[in-house]
From Swiss-Prot:
Its EC number is 5.3.1.16. InterPro entries: Aldolase_TIM (IPR013785), His_biosynth (IPR006062), HisA_bact_arch (IPR006063), Isoase_HisA-like (IPR044524), Isoase_HisA-like_bact (IPR023016), RibuloseP-bd_barrel (IPR011060). Transmembrane segments: none annotated. It is found in: Cytoplasm. It catalyses: 1-(5-phospho-beta-D-ribosyl)-5-[(5-phospho-beta-D-ribosylamino)methylideneamino]imidazole-4-carboxamide = 5-[(5-phospho-1-deoxy-D-ribulos-1-ylimino)methylamino]-1-(5-phospho-beta-D-ribosyl)imidazole-4-carboxamide. Keywords: Amino-acid biosynthesis, Cytoplasm, Histidine biosynthesis, Isomerase. NCBIfam families: 1-(5-phosphoribosyl)-5-[(5-phosphoribosylamino)methylideneamino]imidazole-4-carboxamide isomerase (TIGR00007), PRK13585.1 (NF010112). It is an enzyme of class 5 (isomerase). GO terms for biological process: L-histidine biosynthetic process; L-tryptophan biosynthetic process. This is 1-(5-phosphoribosyl)-5-[(5-phosphoribosylamino)methylideneamino] imidazole-4-carboxamide isomerase. One of its GO terms (molecular function) is 1-(5-phosphoribosyl)-5-[(5-phosphoribosylamino)methylideneamino]imidazole-4-carboxamide isomerase activity.
Length: 251
């Protein structure tokens, strides 16, 4: 089970939002590259970046910070990024800069042909981000709820060749209410590609619960506010996940 620290970028700083609200941003660091280094030193095996300004603007907005992070840790672990990815040119630019994966969210829902083209051009590098509330997909930085069922879209995107799915329960994100395990497992069971859980991770119990269902196809979990607020000790949590995986593998 991969525990993946999130570094959410707004105006070049590392922040956390509550339920995607740009007006409810808590600044945790003015040096995102140093924050990336901290998580890698604590044992992170992948990082999850979000260009928040880009998500709302529809184009890259935190390139300097992203390049600084890649310069700091990009040679050591895979780095994935979402937010504002709406063109093949942007994807190419990011992959050339050293990103391992790009996450396509809103654009995948609104323009499935773009996602298909991206999967064809950059096979193995494309993750789809599905944000949902009560089983329905949301777009545009969570500001618009669609009528699309998450599982229907996930199956379609799997056919396109996406590498994995980041599934966020937006009713829980930034609220420390616990991961929506049931919905995440339901999605993972419906597709044959890995699912990364996101939204609401609050403590070590969430990690233990996720490890129990990892075999359903859950590859990892994105760690946000909980590791910044201190509710979750990242290094201890990754160690615990590794221990549990070892026990489950031996069973």
């Amino acid at each position: 089970m991969l525990l993946i620290p999130a570094i959410d970028l707004k105006d070049g700083q590392c922040v956390r939002l509550k339920q995607g609200d740009m007006d409810q941003a808590t600044i945790f660091s003015e040096d995102p590259a140093a924050m990336a280094r901290k998580w890698v030193d604590l044992g992170a095996r992948r990082l999850h970046l979000v260009d928040l300004n880009g998500a709302f603007a529809g184009k890259p907005k935190n390139l300097e910070a992203i390049e600084a992070i890649l310069g700091e840790v990009g040679d050591e672990i895979p780095v994935q990024l979402g937010g504002g990815i709406r063109s093949l040119e942007t994807i190419e630019k990011y992959l050339d800069a050293g990103l391992s994966y790009v996450i396509i969210g809103t654009a995948a829902v609104k323009d499935p042909g773009f996602l298909q083209d991206a999967c064809s051009a950059f096979a193995g590098n494309i993750i789809v981000g599905l944000d949902a509330k009560d089983g329905k997909v949301a777009t545009d930085g969570w500001s618009k709820l669609t009528g699309h069922e998450v599982i229907d879209l996930a199956r379609k995107f799997e056919d396109y060749g996406v590498e994995s799915i980041v599934y966020t329960d937006i009713g829980r994100d930034g609220m420390l209410q616990g991961i929506n395990i049931e919905a995440t497992v339901k999605l993972a069971q419906a597709v044959g590609i890995p699912v990364i859980a996101s939204g609401g991770l609050s403590n070590i119990v969430d990690i233990e619960k996720l490890c129990e269902v990892e075999d359903e196809g859950i590859e990892g979990v994105i760690c946000g506010r909980a590791i910044y607020s201190g509710d979750l000790d990242f290094a201890a949590a990754q160690k615990r996940a590794d221990e549990l995986n070892g026990e489950l593998d031996d069973a």
